[in-house]
């Protein structure tokens, strides 16, 4: 038997959609688009860090960050 707590009763409405699945693909394509955009963001950050993406007049040096 599960212990019933006040917090559990407050949070119960948040779990009302448990077990319900949208038919078909649902929002999977949207998730794929956001994953691709996040990957591109990480790739750009990595290229800036490695200085393989050169930006004009932007100094990527740890010493200049303190100024």
UniProtKB/Swiss-Prot annotation:
<dbReference type="GO" id="GO:0015979">
    <property type="term" value="P:photosynthesis"/>
</dbReference>
<keyword id="KW-0472">Membrane</keyword>
<dbReference type="InterPro" id="IPR036863">
    <property type="entry name" value="PSII_PsbH_sf"/>
</dbReference>
<keyword id="KW-1133">Transmembrane helix</keyword>
<dbReference type="GO" id="GO:0050821">
    <property type="term" value="P:protein stabilization"/>
</dbReference>
<dbReference type="GO" id="GO:0009523">
    <property type="term" value="C:photosystem II"/>
</dbReference>
<comment type="similarity">
    <text>Belongs to the PsbH family.</text>
</comment>
<dbReference type="GO" id="GO:0042301">
    <property type="term" value="F:phosphate ion binding"/>
</dbReference>
<keyword id="KW-0812">Transmembrane</keyword>
<protein>
    <recommendedName>
        <fullName>Photosystem II reaction center protein H</fullName>
    </recommendedName>
</protein>
<comment type="subunit">
    <text>PSII is composed of 1 copy each of membrane proteins PsbA, PsbB, PsbC, PsbD, PsbE, PsbF, PsbH, PsbI, PsbJ, PsbK, PsbL, PsbM, PsbT, PsbX, PsbY, PsbZ, Psb30/Ycf12, at least 3 peripheral proteins of the oxygen-evolving complex and a large number of cofactors. It forms dimeric complexes.</text>
</comment>
<dbReference type="GO" id="GO:0009535">
    <property type="term" value="C:chloroplast thylakoid membrane"/>
</dbReference>
<comment type="function">
    <text>One of the components of the core complex of photosystem II (PSII), required for its stability and/or assembly. PSII is a light-driven water:plastoquinone oxidoreductase that uses light energy to abstract electrons from H(2)O, generating O(2) and a proton gradient subsequently used for ATP formation. It consists of a core antenna complex that captures photons, and an electron transfer chain that converts photonic excitation into a charge separation.</text>
</comment>
<dbReference type="InterPro" id="IPR001056">
    <property type="entry name" value="PSII_PsbH"/>
</dbReference>
<keyword id="KW-0793">Thylakoid</keyword>
<keyword id="KW-0934">Plastid</keyword>
<keyword id="KW-0604">Photosystem II</keyword>
<keyword id="KW-0602">Photosynthesis</keyword>
<keyword id="KW-0150">Chloroplast</keyword>
<dbReference type="Pfam" id="PF00737">
    <property type="entry name" value="PsbH"/>
</dbReference>
<feature type="transmembrane region" description="Helical">
    <location>
        <begin position="29"/>
        <end position="49"/>
    </location>
</feature>
């Amino acid at each position: 038997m599960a212990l019933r707590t006040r917090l559990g009763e407050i949070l119960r409405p948040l779990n009302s959609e448990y077990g319900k699945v949208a038919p078909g693909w649902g929002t999977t394509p949207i998730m794929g688009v956001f994953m691709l955009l996040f990957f591109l963001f990480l790739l750009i950050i990595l290229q800036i860090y490695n200085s393989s993406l050169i930006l004009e007049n932007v100094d990527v040096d740890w010493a200049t960050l303190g100024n």
